[in-house]
Each structure stands twice: as structure tokens, then as C-alpha cells.
């Protein structure tokens, strides 16, 4: 009797939600960055969309992918972080599998919820580094981990050493800069002790156009520091809105698109 019970009970065991065992595609950002850079090399005009905070809302994320795929004028998609709600491995895998249906390449920033449990490890396994940069046409995109509270301020978040390196190695073909982060300065998650220093770093890059962020599940356009630099906030995917940016040679346009 004991043997029978032991054998039948084996089927009841499931992987722990934080086991961090990743199946399927990895290094998504690296692979998609190569596609973006190759397709836009030498161009001075392009268009990208932004979505953010897709945690829990799998149906809405599926609908966003379908809406974006109906267009033929978008070059890539940026995700502002919080793919997961609890940092569980399966949440990242589910989101990756949905986003991989996009016809265009996409990249993901890390959100504060993505740090929970073993979330940061899984994010790195599937998507890659939490600070990274790439060049689309003549624009340098700098993607930052700004979730300082999740480290209890024990690590340099935002990472000014990374920013120093990016400025020192700024590509010759890049003429403008755009920043993407999950939490903006002033957020309870941001290290607001250095918010003014951070803004000066951002402004010190060549022709900084604007900053993008998510986190608060709202849509807004704010001049956070009163210096003319706009911060565009992308709402959570439950709002069924994505942001659309068209970069032109001498300017850019912005649109919030409902679907």
C-alpha cells in the first residue's frame, strides 16, 4: 500500500514558482537589438511604440500585440517593465511567449515587480542585462534600471558608472538620445536622493529628446524638473493604450493610441 501511494503521489509535485528554471528563448533583448540596429542603420526617421506594465493582464497584452501587428508602419516596440506581478518564472515565460508574436522586434526594461523573488535572475536569463543601450537610426536609446527601492539602496541604482561609460562610448552615428526606465524621478521606487544629479546626467547626453517610463499605470506628459525635458508616462496595458513616437530628422511626434 505504501509503495502504491508513493508512486501515485509523485504526479502531484509541481515546480516551485520561483525555481528560476527557464525554458525557451533567451537573450531576447540582445537578439532583437541586432534586428533593430540592422534594419534602421543610416536612417533618420522611424517609428516605435511603447507598452508597459502588462503584469496579470495576459488577454489585454494579447490584444495589444494584435493591434500592433495590424500596423505596417512600426519599426519596433519598447516595454517599460513589470512583465510580472510576483516575479514568478512562469509569468516571464508567458509574457515572452505573447510578445514574441509581434511582427517587429521588441525590447523590455525591468520593472520593480520583476525583482520580486527570483525575478531579476529570470529577467536576466530571458531578456538580458537590466541596463543596456542600442542605436536605432541616429538615436541612442539608453534603458535603465531605476528600481532602487528593490535593492534597499544597497546598489548604485540608477547606475551612474554605466551612464559614464555610455557617454564616453557614445556612437559616432548617433545624434540624439532617448531614455527608457520603469520608475521616473520622484517615484517612491526611485532613489530621489540623486534625482537632480540623475537629471543632469540625462541632459548631458547629446540632444536628449525625452524620457519614457511606466510604473504608475497612468498616462501623462510632464516636465518633471521644469527644464524643458519631457517625461512620457505609459499606462498599464489594462488601459488598452499604447504610445506611438515618430522620430523625424528635425523633430518628433507623439500619439496615445487606443485599441
PLM feature spans:
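Active-site glycine-centered loops adjacent to acidic/histidine catalytic or metal-binding residues
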Residues: 53, 81-82, 111-112, 182, ...
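Binuclear metal-dependent phosphoesterase catalytic core
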Residues: 14-30, 51, 134, 220-259
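Core catalytic region of metal-dependent phosphoesterases/phosphodiesterases
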Residues: 61-136
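His/acidic metal-ligating clusters that form di-metal
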Residues: 69-76, 151-230
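Alpha-helical scaffolding within the catalytic cores
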Residues: 26-36, 59-66, 90-95, 118-132, ...
Amino acid at each position: 500500500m505504501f509503495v502504491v501511494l508513493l508512486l501515485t503521489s509523485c504526479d502531484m509535485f509541481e515546480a516551485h514558482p520561483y525555481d528560476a528554471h527557464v525554458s525557451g528563448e533567451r537573450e531576447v533583448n540582445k537578439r532583437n537589438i541586432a534586428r533593430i540596429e540592422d534594419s534602421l542603420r543610416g536612417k533618420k526617421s522611424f517609428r516605435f511604440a511603447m507598452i508597459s506594465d502588462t503584469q496579470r493582464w495576459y488577454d489585454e497584452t494579447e490584444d495589444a500585440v494584435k493591434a500592433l501587428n495590424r500596423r505596417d508602419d512600426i519599426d519596433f516596440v519598447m516595454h517599460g517593465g513589470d512583465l510580472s506581478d510576483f516575479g514568478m518564472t512562469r509569468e516571464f515565460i508567458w509574457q515572452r511567449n505573447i510578445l514574441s508574436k509581434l511582427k517587429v522586434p521588441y525590447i523590455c526594461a525591468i520593472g520593480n515587480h520583476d525583482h520580486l523573488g527570483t525575478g531579476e535572475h529570470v529577467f536576466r536569463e530571458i531578456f538580458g542585462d537590466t541596463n543596456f543601450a542600442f542605436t536605432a537610426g541616429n538615436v541612442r536609446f539608453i534603458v535603465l534600471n531605476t528600481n532602487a527601492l528593490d535593492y534597499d539602496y544597497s546598489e548604485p541604482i540608477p547606475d551612474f558608472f554605466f551612464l559614464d561609460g555610455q557617454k564616453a562610448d557614445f556612437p559616432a552615428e548617433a545624434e540624439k538620445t532617448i531614455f527608457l526606465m520603469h520608475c521616473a524621478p520622484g517615484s517612491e521606487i526611485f532613489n530621489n536622493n540623486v534625482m537632480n544629479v540623475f537629471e543632469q546626467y540625462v541632459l548631458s547626453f547629446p540632444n536628449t529628446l525625452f524620457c519614457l517610463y511606466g510604473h504608475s499605470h497612468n498616462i501623462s506628459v510632464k516636465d518633471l524638473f521644469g527644464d524643458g525635458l519631457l517625461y512620457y508616462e505609459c499606462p498599464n496595458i489594462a488601459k488598452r493604450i499604447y504610445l506611438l513616437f515618430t522620430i523625424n530628422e528635425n523633430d518628433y511626434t507623439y500619439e496615445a493610441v487606443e485599441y
